[in-house]
A protein has these predicted regions:
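Non-catalytic accessory segments of DNA primases and related replication-initiation nucleases
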Residues: 1-111, 119-142, 223-227, 231, ...
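Phosphate-handling DNA/RNA-contact segment within nucleic-acid enzymes
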Residues: 104-211
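A charged alpha-helical hairpin associated with nucleic-acid processing machineries
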Residues: 244-247, 264-274
Length: 274
């Protein structure tokens, strides 16, 4: 099968998580399309074109991408007037998040942008509109390092905490600062949910070893995708610890929204006792 393009998933609404493939049936001499959602659904979705031809896709040039990155970097640091998703705004600032503005009036906050890097270089942004559950990419968004990796390196000694989403990473950092003694912690988020853990850990494995990272602490979603990701990590790394969530929270951001910030922080910091 040949990868064709990435589309929004119609079921979980994740942007660019539906990978389309072109397949060849040699016995019948026919080509056909199939797809798979690598985000929350984590399942095959069939032909996204319903038997029709694939639309022509414009391939962005390096100049196009460079201009997009320049525009994104010119946007202000994320700075809403109140907490967002229960997290104090200053935490978003410390993670380098940008505030993308409405293209209609140029002043109304429209989306939050999460910086994406590869080997230390800023290569793209993952953006989420403030008023709906959706994502869109700016610049390079595939084949990138986990969100927060460059931030984590100078903070890490022998332990790295891993979440399944950008909001969860920032929320977990917030929780641990309340429960612990440090002002910042080495937390990263998988680039495309739990289904990307194999790809992410394989991409950064040599750097983890070089920097003498010993423990990987997983604070993933309490769902099927999260459980599969935990099993995958246990096959890829020797010292993997799985942290439970307090109360009815299914992830770190839930813990914040439910008022379990300190409890979540204590569980994450006490990973060897969980």
């Amino acid at each position: 099968a040949t990868a064709v393009e990435k589309l929004p998933c119609p079921d979980c609404n994740s942007r660019q998580s539906l990978q389309v493939f072109l397949n060849r049936d040699e016995a019948l001499g026919l080509d056909f399309y199939s797809s798979f959602c690598f985000s929350e659904c984590w399942e095959a979705k069939g032909d996204p074109y319903n038997g029709g031809p694939a639309p022509e896709v414009y391939v962005k040039t390096k100049e196009d991408i460079a201009n997009e990155l320049k525009t994104a970097k010119s946007c202000p640091i994320f700075n809403l007037r109140s907490n967002y998703r229960g997290i104090p705004i200053e935490y978003f600032k410390s993670w380098g998040c940008r505030q993308f503005l409405s293209e209609f009036d140029g002043t109304t906050p429209y989306a939050i942008g999460f910086p994406l890097s590869l080997e230390g270089e800023l290569v793209g942004w993952k953006a989420r509109p403030l008023r709906k559950k959706d994502f869109f990419g700016i610049g390079k968004t595939s084949g990138v390092d986990p969100f927060g990796l460059e931030r984590a390196w100078p903070l890490a000694t022998d332990t790295l905490w891993i979440t399944e989403g950008e909001f969860d990473a920032i929320a977990l950092d917030y929780c641990m600062t309340l429960a612990g003694k440090s002002k910042m912690y080495p937390v990263i988020s998988l680039s495309h949910g739990g289904g990307s853990i194999n790809k992410n850990l394989s991409l950064i494995r040599d750097r983890l070893i070089k920097r003498k990272i010993k423990n990987l602490v997983l604070v993933l979603d309490d769902d099927e995708v999260g459980k599969l990701a935990e099993k995958a990590a246990l096959r890829l790394w020797d010292n993997v610890y799985i942290v439970s969530k307090p109360g009815l929270a299914k992830d770190a951001n839930d813990a914040v929204l439910f008022g379990y910030e300190i409890e979540m922080g204590k569980l994450a910091l006490g990973f060897k006792n969980d």
